[in-house]
């Protein structure tokens, strides 16, 4: 599995804003939106394009557009804050949804909804989730996508852990990871250290 960690001063500054426990919800959401844009930019760096002819106000020119916009799949609820930024950069993208909660006693993912196209053969997919902790939620999402024929999947995560990366590598599922940071690991409660806290709560308030 390929892992690309974004190395950019703006990404580092936005990540710092998100990490800071003093950051208000609205500022956290804005930083997540901006950082998502950077992750999408990096994820599309090698995307194939189609060329076509246009006319500028001065002369004819050859333009470019994405050959196939990705399907965006936010993992609810934390991934919801990444959708607008991703769709803003790729306005032709479709959006699917996967809902997964966390069992606080077992630290295991608890799926509760999915809304995805039935046939994803040949369709690039971007999974949006701010945090790759144990990797359980991401693995479940990847399994849903692979069962529908997806073979070109990119996970966009603000922070990841070695444990989460290992989970994806062991899964054998077709995925690459684009992240702003690989953190130290997980604590006894399976929270990322130093991490962001609960990304859903920090965007929308406690459940």
Swiss-Prot record:
Signal peptide residue numbers: none
Reported EC number(s) for this entry are: 2.4.2.9
Q: How is the cofactor bound?
A: Binds 1 Mg(2+) ion per subunit. The magnesium is bound as Mg-PRPP.
Tell me what reaction this enzyme catalyses.
UMP + diphosphate = 5-phospho-alpha-D-ribose 1-diphosphate + uracil
BP terms from Gene Ontology: UMP salvage; uracil salvage
This protein's pathway reads: Pyrimidine metabolism; UMP biosynthesis via salvage pathway; UMP from uracil: step 1/1
Keywords, ordered alphabetically:
Allosteric enzyme, Glycosyltransferase, GTP-binding, Magnesium, Nucleotide-binding, Transferase
Record-linked CDD domains: PRTases_typeI (cd06223)
Q: How, per the record, is this protein's activity regulated?
A: Allosterically activated by GTP.
Its biological purpose: Catalyzes the conversion of uracil and 5-phospho-alpha-D-ribose 1-diphosphate (PRPP) to UMP and diphosphate.
The UniProt family comment states: Belongs to the UPRTase family.
Mind telling me what this protein is named? Answer: Uracil phosphoribosyltransferase
What organism is the protein native to? Answer: Nocardia farcinica (strain IFM 10152)
């Amino acid at each position: 599995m390929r892992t690309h960690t974004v190395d950019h001063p703006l990404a580092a500054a936005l990540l710092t804003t998100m990490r800071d426990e003093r950051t208000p919800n609205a500022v956290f959401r804005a930083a997540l939106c901006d950082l998502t844009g950077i992750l999408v930019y990096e994820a599309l760096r090698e995307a194939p394009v189609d060329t076509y002819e246009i006319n500028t106000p001065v002369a004819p020119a050859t333009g470019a557009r994405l050959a196939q916009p990705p399907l965006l799949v936010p993992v609810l609820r934390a991934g919801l804050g990444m959708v607008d930024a991703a769709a803003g950069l790729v306005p032709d993208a479709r959006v699917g949804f996967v809902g997964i909660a966390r069992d606080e006693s077992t630290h295991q993912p608890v799926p509760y909804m999915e809304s995805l196209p039935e046939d994803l053969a040949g369709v690039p997919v971007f999974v949006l989730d701010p945090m790759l902790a144990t990797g359980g939620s991401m693995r479940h999402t990847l399994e849903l996508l692979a069962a529908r024929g997806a073979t070109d999947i990119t996970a966009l995560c603000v922070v990841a852990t070695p444990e989460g990366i290992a989970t994806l590598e062991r899964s054998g599922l077709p995925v690459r990871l684009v992240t702003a940071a690989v953190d130290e690991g997980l604590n006894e409660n399976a929270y990322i250290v130093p991490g962001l806290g609960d990304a859903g709560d920090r965007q929308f308030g406690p459940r």
